[in-house]
């Protein structure tokens, strides 16, 4: 049993999963979506939920630096509702401020990755950081792993 972390954007969803003990998170893939056309990648998410035996979702909440909520927060909450309705599994949110910036910094400094390569993995790495922060903060869904 694992938790699935998600970095929800308007065109992609970065996906990560925890290990079975809830200690670490690893990036899995980036699922293409299109909010304007109401294509949310749910079929692929269904496959991943089954493959990894997911028991709950942790979505990044992209609050503004002053802690206010903008339109992307609403989009993340709506995606969470869609997941809850589709899977009947619990969801929780993790403040994701600066996770994409941190992911990009890691790719530049530690992996010396080119801009084109960074673009292909950044959402997956951001999802991993979101879930890792959640696990380290002992979020309420961690008990579901036991």
From Swiss-Prot:
Q: Name one GO biological process term.
A: rRNA 5'-end processing
- Per its UniProt record, what InterPro entries does this chain match? RNaseH-like_sf, YqgF, YqgF/RNaseH-like_dom, YqgF/RNaseH-like_dom_sf
Q: Where in the cell is it found?
A: Cytoplasm
SMART domains, per the entry: YqgFc (SM00732)
Q: A GO CC term? A: cytosol
Q: Which Pfam families match?
A: RuvX
Known EC number(s)? 3.1.-.-
Which keywords does this Swiss-Prot/TrEMBL entry list? Cytoplasm, Hydrolase, Nuclease, Ribosome biogenesis
The GO terms this record gives for MF are: nuclease activity
Q: Extract the signal peptide range.
A: none
- Domain of life from the UniProt record: Bacteria
State the family named in the UniProt similarity comment for this chain. Answer: Belongs to the YqgF nuclease family.
Output the NCBIfam families linked to this UniProt entry.
RNAse_H_YqgF (TIGR00250)
Function, as annotated, reads: Could be a nuclease involved in processing of the 5'-end of pre-16S rRNA.
Record-given protein name:
Putative pre-16S rRNA nuclease
Species the sequence originates in: Pediococcus pentosaceus (strain ATCC 25745 / CCUG 21536 / LMG 10740 / 183-1w)
């Amino acid at each position: 049993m694992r938790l699935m972390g998600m970095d929800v954007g308007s065109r992609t969803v970065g996906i990560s999963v925890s290990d079975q003990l809830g200690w670490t998170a690893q990036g899995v893939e980036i699922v293409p979506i299109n909010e304007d056309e109401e294509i949310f990648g749910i079929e692929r998410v269904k496959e991943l939920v089954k493959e990894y035996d997911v028991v709950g979702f942790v979505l990044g909440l992209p609050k503004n630096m002053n802690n206010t909520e903008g339109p992307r927060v609403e989009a993340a909450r709506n995606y969470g509702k869609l997941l809850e309705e589709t899977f009947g599994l619990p969801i929780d949110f993790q403040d994701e401020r600066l996770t994409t910036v941190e992911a990009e910094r890691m790719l530049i400094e530690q992996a010396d990755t080119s801009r084109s390569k960074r673009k292909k993995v950044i959402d997956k790495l951001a999802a991993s950081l979101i879930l890792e922060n959640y696990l380290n903060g002992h979020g309420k869904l961690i008990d579901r792993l036991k």
